[in-house]
């Protein structure tokens, strides 16, 4: 048998390389931000504290005016007492009491605003914790960061009215381990302690969004709807703030109201809601009623969005990407509520006509 020699041939595909490209005097064009991303950026920009010389001068002027008013009232009381002008003395005492009550209210408003700013600082610290977890820094598993995260969580629990012997806090502490990082400690706190507060806020948002949608859908007066929805949105913000342990005064409420004004500038929400609503509306509903239903859905979605934004702002720990509440479950409940009430009412009306 003759020896056969096989030659090993390697088929190498020729690789075609593109020649290098050189760009001279070219302008780079950035991608346009989406509507939701642009709205979030505007929200964050509107909520950032702005320090300026004018504000400092205004505060200093208000302080001098308050001190001068108190001094003038005391001088008025003393002069009236020396001259035995008892009527003027009574007016001076009443004026001083009113001024002191006003100063007390201003101090309380300032303390509430300080608490709200403290809540914002906690959110920034938690965002830094999530950011360190995302980039996988070398200091992520340091003992110092873990202790800071634990202290932060305990301070948040105290602000929510939860003591160290609270069942949820005890359950969270039992889950802790010395090997856990700062991110894991904060995540466990969010899951065991803050989850109940989140559930209350989500339930409240779904309820008030559905109620607003139904009321707008069946109400014939647009002016009444406008003021009613504005009042309900403010009430929704107040209730969400109460759930997360924030006492809103005048200035903190103004600060949260900025978020409402930014979110009111939504683009095309009513038109999108109308397209969604027309999918399930039956053909026997009149065009006018269909428009009212679509408007109700749009208002309900707007209320839900405002509630979610207020929830993100009032929550002491910033949401992780997988924890952020979505409008999908609220949208389903919204559609079913409006459909059942409005279309049910329409069927009853037709039966009465028959």
From Swiss-Prot:
Q: Which organism is it from?
A: Haemophilus influenzae (strain ATCC 51907 / DSM 11121 / KW20 / Rd)
**Per UniProt, what is one Pfam family of this protein?**
DUF697
Q: Which taxonomic lineage does the organism of this UniProt entry have?
A: Bacteria, Pseudomonadati, Pseudomonadota, Gammaproteobacteria, Pasteurellales
Which protein is depicted?
UPF0283 membrane protein HI_0043
Amino-acid biosynthesis keyword on record? no
Per the UniProt record, which residue ranges are transmembrane? 57-77, 87-107, 211-231
**NCBIfam families tied to this protein:** hyp_HI0043
Q: Which UniProt keywords apply?
A: Cell inner membrane, Cell membrane, Membrane, Transmembrane, Transmembrane helix
Which protein family is named in the record?
A: Belongs to the UPF0283 family.
State if NAD is listed as a keyword.
no
Q: Which GO terms describe its cellular component?
A: plasma membrane
Chief subcellular site? membrane
Domain of life, per the record?
Answer: Bacteria
Please state where this protein is localized: Cell inner membrane
Q: How does it sit in the membrane?
A: Multi-pass membrane protein
């Amino acid at each position: 048998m003759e020896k056969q020699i096989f030659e090993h041939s390697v088929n190498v595909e020729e690789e075609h390389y593109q020649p290098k490209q050189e760009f001279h005097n070219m302008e780079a064009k950035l991608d346009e931000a989406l509507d939701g991303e642009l709205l979030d950026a505007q929200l964050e920009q509107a909520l950032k504290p702005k320090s300026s010389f004018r504000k400092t001068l205004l505060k200093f002027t208000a302080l001098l005016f308050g001190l001068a008013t108190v001094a003038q009232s005391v001088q008025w009381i003393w002069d009236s007492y020396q001259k035995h002008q008892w009527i003027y003395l009574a007016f001076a005492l009443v004026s001083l009491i009113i001024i002191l009550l006003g100063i007390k209210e201003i101090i309380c408003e300032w303390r509430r605003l300080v608490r709200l700013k403290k809540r914002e600082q906690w959110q920034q610290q938690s965002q830094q914790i999530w950011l360190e977890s995302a980039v996988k820094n070398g200091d992520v598993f340091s003992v110092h960061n873990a202790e800071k995260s634990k202290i932060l969580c305990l301070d948040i629990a105290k602000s929510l009215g939860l003591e160290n012997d609270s069942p949820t806090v005890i359950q969270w502490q039992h889950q802790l381990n010395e090997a856990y990082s700062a991110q894991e400690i904060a995540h466990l706190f969010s899951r065991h302690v803050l989850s109940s507060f989140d559930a209350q806020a989500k339930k409240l948002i779904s309820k008030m969004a559905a109620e607003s949608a139904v009321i707008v859908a069946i109400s014939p007066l647009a002016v009444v709807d406008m003021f009613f929805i504005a009042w309900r949105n403010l009430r929704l913000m107040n209730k969400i703030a109460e759930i997360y342990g924030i006492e809103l005064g005048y200035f903190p409420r103004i600060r949260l109201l900025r978020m409402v004004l930014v979110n009111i500038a939504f683009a095309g929400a009513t038109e999108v809601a109308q397209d969604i609503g027309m999918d399930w509306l039956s053909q026997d509903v009149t065009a006018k009623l269909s428009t009212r239903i679509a408007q109700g859905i749009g208002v309900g979605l707007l209320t839900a969005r405002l509630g979610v934004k207020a929830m993100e702002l009032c929550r002491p720990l910033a949401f992780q990407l997988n924890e952020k509440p979505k409008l999908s479950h609220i949208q389903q409940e919204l559609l079913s509520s409006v459909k059942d009430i409005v279309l049910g009412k329409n069927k009853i009306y037709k039966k009465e006509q028959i």
